[in-house]
Amino acid sequence: MAWTVFIDGKEGTTGLRIFDRLAERGEFSLLTLPEEKRKDADARREAIHAADIAILCLPDAAARESVALAEGSNTRILDTSTAHRVAPGWAYGFPELSKKHRDAVVSGQYVAVPGCHASGFIALAAPLVAAGLIPVDALLSCFSLTGYSGGGKKMIAQYEADTRTPDLDAPRPYGLTQSHKHLPEMQQISCLTHAPIFAPIVADYYAGMQVTIPLFRQQLNCAHPVEELTACLKAHYASSPIVSVLDAQDVAAFGGFIPANAPAGKDSMKLMVLGNDDRIELVSLFDNLGKGSSGAAIECLNLMTGAPETTGLNL
């Protein structure tokens, strides 16, 4: 079957990557609008209604507008924005979390692609909370290092400009008021009573993300955390072709340093349990533009259209 797809907002970083990836696949027919019509509500409505699936690569307000424009159609919506990730009636597009999540993506009319930082946090926390190893009322903290491509076209231009300012040479913490837009999904999808303290950091490299959750043994419901947390994550992701858990020898291959840009260009995600049985670090390593963005969208689209989950992914 040929699927008609309209990417609303294909001019942005995520939209362009999705468009280019789908253009290489014969099962998709891509609807496009001329430049002068891409913000025209009537033209967008017509394209959305003509599509089998509309992929929204827009700011939150515009994504909500597109969903409203889709009313009265049978078009399925795949939204990459923050607007609907914890909204009732929307499937959360991280199918590795559970059969329920996978089935919701497969059959849902409305699917929300997870946030990049949130993906790394939830991949680690959600299975451990579900298993009871992390209490639901745990007071967690998390820091996340990302390449500057996560900031979109404007930030990419700032970092790559000949006239860039010296402050861009250093890592830059942001989200300083603990109101980052990924926090609601980090809490809700992980089934936590409290949102974590979240410290995102953007650094001077293009792509790649490393999310870390530091823990004391006293925060956990286990006596041998490194062994037990690793075993839990390995069991949870045993059947996943995309998310995997590294063994000690795999971690040792990094030589004592984990480069956050190592997964650039990949759509996979690697998880690690580091430290010792008193002080532990849970780490996820992936491309913010891959499993953190366009790769996750392609994975969801594959499931929505009945294609093999990894079709078109670079693992």
Locate each region found by the language model.
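General small-molecule cofactor/ligand-binding pocket signal
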Residues: 31, 197-199, 246
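Short amphipathic alpha-helical segments
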Residues: 107-109, 209-211, 278-280
